UniProtKB/Swiss-Prot annotation:
GO molecular function: lipid binding
Protein name according to UniProt: Fatty acid-binding protein 1
Keywords from the named record: Cytoplasm, Lipid-binding, Transport
Pfam families: Lipocalin_7 (PF14651)
Recorded domain comment: Forms a beta-barrel structure that accommodates hydrophobic ligands in its interior.
Family: Belongs to the calycin superfamily. Fatty-acid binding protein (FABP) family.
Source lineage: Eukaryota, Metazoa, Ecdysozoa, Arthropoda, Hexapoda
Location(s) in or outside the cell: Cytoplasm
Coiled-coil regions, chain positions: none
Chief localization: cytoplasm
Length: 132
């Protein structure tokens, strides 16, 4: 778990706009999210983890326990249930809401982080890449 504590900065993305459109965002919202190029960091604190995302909009910290479902609210006030599972160099986040589910699979490989994004409402796959 050499990736713990490393800061990964956004590098590039593939098909992210397709994912955003599939979850019903307006063109204006899609354009805003396409500008979202955060850095991310995962820290372990005892039995819990803290996922830290920093962007021009500020800092968001999410504390979770692997395999335990938590309640959260995303931009726009939509309530969601999220489960993070940590397995070696992979952190899988499953998000469930009234609109469906999405999976964010974060694969850490040295100084690279690849996030694979899928959704129950979309046949496509999106990727976001980060570098430490």
């Amino acid at each position: 778990m050499a990736y713990l504590g490393k800061v990964y900065k956004f590098d590039r993305e593939e098909n992210f706009d397709g994912f955003l459109k599939s979850i019903g965002l307006s063109e204006e919202q899609v354009q805003k999210y396409l500008q979202y190029k955060p850095s991310s960091q995962l820290v372990k604190e005892g039995d819990k983890y803290k996922y830290i995302s920093v962007s021009s909009d500020g800092t968001k910290e999410t504390v979770f326990e692997s395999g335990v479902e938590t309640d959260d609210v995303v931009q726009g006030g939509l309530p969601i249930k999220t489960t993070y599972t940590v397995d070696g160099n992979t952190v899988t986040q499953v998000v469930n809401s009234a609109q469906g589910s999405a999976t964010f699979k974060r694969e850490y490989n040295g100084d690279e982080l690849k996030v694979t994004i899928t959704s129950s409402e979309w046949d496509g796959v999106a990727y976001r890449y980060y570098k430490a």
